[in-house]
Each structure stands twice: as C-alpha cells, then as structure tokens.
C-alpha cells in the first residue's frame, strides 16, 4: 500500500515548482532560439549548418521536457485533490 506523507498543500506547492520549472525551460529555449537566429545571420558554411541541425534536433526534446514538467504538475494537483476528497469521505463516514 502506498504511503503519502505530504499534505495536499505541500503537494500543491511542489506542483507549482514543476510549473515554474517548465516556464523556465521554455524561457531558456526561447532565448537560445533568438540567439540562434543572431548567429545564423552572421555565420555561413557547413559548420554552422551542422550546428544548426543539432540545435533544431534538440529543441523539440526540450519542449517535450517542459511539457512533461507541466504534466507532473497536473498529476500532483490531482493527487492532492484525491487525498482531500478521500479524507473528507472518511470523516463523513465516521461522523455519520
């Protein structure tokens, strides 16, 4: 049987940290994409083409990671809600 030692409030606090992490990852990717455009305007040749191909290959993986962090946020929020609801259900069964 699972044992959760965190309160719903603590789970929600953790969930917010995952959202913040997702936003930070997205912001970094956006900044690097802008920087990539600056480099692109000033660097021609096959070396840059290889560099750009690598960047373009990795960018979607970073976007997927940001989405994963958002998904974890949603899962933690659901768990917090379930814990609260279960606690309320048990309390109502006991009291009456």
From Swiss-Prot:
Coiled coil located at which positions?
Answer: none
| Pfam families the UniProt entry points to | WXG100
Q: Which domain of life is it from?
A: Bacteria
InterPro entries, alphabetically? ESAT-6-like_sf, T7SS_ESAT-6-like
Report the NCBIfam families cross-referenced here. Answer: WXG100_ESAT6 (TIGR03930)
The record's comment on protein family reads: Belongs to the WXG100 family. sagEsxA-like subfamily.
Report what the protein is called: ESAT-6-like protein SAG1039
């Amino acid at each position: 049987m699972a044992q959760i030692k965190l309160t719903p409030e603590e789970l929600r606090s953790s969930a917010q940290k995952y959202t913040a992490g997702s936003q930070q990852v997205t912001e970094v990717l956006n900044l690097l994409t802008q920087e990539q455009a600056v480099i692109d305007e000033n660097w021609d040749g096959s070396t840059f083409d290889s560099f750009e191909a690598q960047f373009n290959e990795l960018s979607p993986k970073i976007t997927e990671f940001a989405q994963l962090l958002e998904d974890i946020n949603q899962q933690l929020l659901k768990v917090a809600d379930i814990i609260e609801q279960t606690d309320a259900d048990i309390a109502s069964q006991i009291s009456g």
